[in-house]
Curated annotation (Swiss-Prot):
The active site is at H152, D197, S297. It comes from Mus musculus (Mouse). GO terms for biological process: proteolysis. It is an enzyme of class 3 (hydrolase). The chain crosses the membrane at residues 352-372. Residues 112-345 form the Peptidase S1 domain. InterPro entries: Peptidase_S1_PA, Peptidase_S1_PA_chymotrypsin, Peptidase_S1A, Trypsin_dom, TRYPSIN_HIS, TRYPSIN_SER. Testis-specific. Expressed by primary and secondary spermatocytes. Glycans are attached at N208. It is found in: Membrane; Cytoplasm. The lineage of its organism: Eukaryota, Metazoa, Chordata, Craniata, Vertebrata. This is Serine protease 44. Residues 31-72 are annotated as: Disordered.
Length: 372
């Protein structure tokens, strides 16, 4: 019996050593691209259709304010930035290694009604991050397992779920998937301005793509959307600064402003000497005053390049809602591509490591039984 126990102990040591090596693995070099990306040459302006109902304003912010400014600080966060936490103990399906969306990302199969796409299928990557079936923030689907949103949308260990597949929040037909895990950028902060406002949401089980549900493309790190490019932001946020959130998904067309110019505009408005829009941010502006508002946070800012829709930004913050001359600020997705790949790869490694720990525990249990 001692001899048999020794064999099991040797196997246990071998598995532990293997787990340690795999736990240190970071599969970034071998991780495939998230999606085929548009080249920087030959970018054509999107032939998008006219907006249906304009959004106004931006999410709340904790930035310093001029006297009389109606912008209110965001609610305090209740999580540790940079850490992943489980919101539900779910294991309905085995977690796969990271598999990027197919080359079909960034395309939509909208029905044409009156010469333009119907809302139900116009933005198939748009999701609603919800708690107890109440809309909290927007987000966008980047693969069958993952959603991308803003870090300031995460309030702690709540029972989050993701709503997708319909433009109507009251619809009884949508897909609603519980959230298994959320990864917040480790350097997210709202101390002086909002920085690194990005988070990844892991679904409890993979979504099935359909005409109503499709992933959006994520740009390469080197991709920079040019100033003046026409893009679209979507969400279920407020349609007026002092109004209510919308039941139907809204959209508005914006012109891109690079972070350097946007920073100067906002500094001039606020009389502030601090850098408000840092590298990793990008801005959008509509001359008529429409943009995103409270409730739109975390949602996508997308642009069409070569007939493919690419997410260039995540709704982050702004001053008030729909004010003429006030651009809205977005997290620039291309700047965080390496972080996205790293975290998705790390999640895959962690799951594999967890499987090995379970295997070791089972082997140890068998060794004890044999010894007895």
């Amino acid at each position: 019996m001692a001899f048999q126990g020794c064999d099991c102990f040797g196997l246990l040591v071998w598995l532990l050593l293997l787990q340690t090596r795999l736990g240190k693995a970071r599969m970034v070099p071998g991780t495939p691209s998230l999606s085929p990306l548009p080249s920087e040459n030959g970018l054509d302006d999107s032939g998008v259709n006219p907006q249906e109902r304009p959004l106004t304003g931006m999410p709340e912010t904790s930035l310093p304010r001029k006297p009389g400014d109606s912008t209110r600080p965001l609610d305090s966060m209740a999580f540790t930035p940079g850490q992943s936490f489980s919101t539900m103990s779910l294991s309905r399906q085995p977690f796969p290694t990271w598999v990027p969306p197919t080359s079909a990302c960034g395309h939509r199969t909208a029905r044409i009604v009156g010469g333009r796409p119907a809302p139900a299928r116009k933005w198939p990557w748009q999701v609603s991050l919800q708690v107890h079936k109440q809309h909290i923030c927007g987000g966008s689907l980047i693969s069958k397992w993952w959603v991308i949103t803003a870090a300031h949308c995460v309030y702690g260990h709540l029972d989050y779920a993701v709503f997708m597949g319909d433009a109507d929040l009251w619809s009884k037909r949508p897909v609603r998937i519980p959230v298994q895990d959320i990864i917040v950028h480790q350097d997210f902060s709202m101390m002086r301005t909002v920085v690194h406002d990005i988070a990844l949401v892991l679904l409890a089980f993979p979504v099935n793509y359909s005409v109503n549900i499709q992933p959006v493309c994520i740009p390469e790190k080197s991709f920079l959307v040019q100033p003046g490019t026409l893009c679209w932001v979507t969400g279920w946020g407020k349609v007026l600064e002092q109004g209510r959130s919308s039941r139907i998904l809204q959209e508005i067309e914006l012109n891109i402003i690079r972070h350097e110019k946007c920073n100067q505009i906002l500094k001039d408005i606020m009389g502030n000497i601090f850098t408000l829009v840092q590298e990793g941010g990008v801005c959008g502006y509509n001359e008529k005053g429409g943009d995103a508002c409270q409730g739109d946070s975390g949602g996508p800012l997308v642009c069409e390049f070569n007939k493919t829709w690419v997410q260039v930004g995540i709704v982050s913050w702004g001053l008030g809602c729909g004010r003429i001359g006030y651009p809205g600020v977005y997290t620039e997705v291309s700047y965080y591509r390496d972080w996205i790949i790293k975290e998705l790869s790390r999640a895959s490694c962690w799951k594999l490591s967890g499987f090995l720990v379970l295997s070791v525990c089972l082997v140890l249990h068998l060794a004890i039984v044999v010894a007895l």
